Amino acid sequence: MLIYYTSEFSRRYKRLSQDIKEQAKEKEKIFCKNHFDPRLKTHKLNGTASNYWAFSVDYNYRIIFKFYEKNSVIFIAIGDHSIYKDF
């Protein structure tokens, strides 16, 4: 599984607290093994963001991503629920 990171994702990630960064790393490990592990609550987005998917880092934080090629994804953004309005 290859994961690519957009500059937007990297910029938002740098601003997160250390606790959220650690949780995100753990969820990324789970994601690499199984995109649809129930602990991630992976879901497809709707409306203008229907090409994107998201999974939960914790109750408030999400990672938005897009499937890319056969065995890779692009992490687009990370943040609280307000990131949905950017799509």
Listing of model-derived features with the role each one plays in the protein:
Residues 1-27:
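Arg/Lys-rich, positively charged N-terminal/basic patches that mediate binding to nucleic acids
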Residues 30-55:
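A short, surface-exposed loop/turn module that caps and links secondary-structure elements
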Residues 12, 34, 58-59:
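Intrinsically disordered, low-complexity serine/threonine-rich segments
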Residues 7, 57-62, 66-87:
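Enriched for short, Lys/Arg-rich terminal
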Residues 27-30, 81:
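Conserved short hydrophobic interaction patches
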Residues 17, 37, 42, 75, ...:
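Generic secondary-structure boundary/loop-capping signal
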